[in-house]
Amino acid sequence: MGGCDTPHKGMGYYERLTELIPDDALILSAACGKFRYNARDYGTIEGIPRFLDFGQCNNVYSIIEIAIALANELGTDVNSLPVSIVLSWMEQKAIAILYSLLYLGVKGIYIGPKPPDFLTPGVFEILRKQFDLKLIADPEKDLRSMFNKGINVEESAPLAEELD
């Protein structure tokens, strides 16, 4: 999770999403949007903090490098990893993060709380088709989608129960 903080009422989404992420998942974060959710104690997984703060907007590239290295080590690509990217935006730095991710071919990125003004409906539709770019909506439904990468989760599935 990364990007800008903004006074937009939709920013509560990010805090709620971090509350819902299961205890066996890591949260890698950078940029000022993290100040909405970084004060909570997320605990650890085998001694590794669940919440890893990488710093400012510019440092999102470090998270990208980690994902690329992990994909290379596993002999796959970033889009095949069980990783979801959720960006909040307000200004140019967050847009630069999005451009970097798109340039690298990363798909399935969630952005919000609303689309950037320059993303006309036509441009957004092209990015949606080519990169599976998504607007944030409901944290519970989005998390279900993130964990299943497009596979439908039955309402009685363990993840569905965990989100309730």
Task: Give each language-model segment a name.
Residues 1-164:
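Anaerobic metallocofactor- and corrinoid-dependent redox/one-carbon enzyme cores
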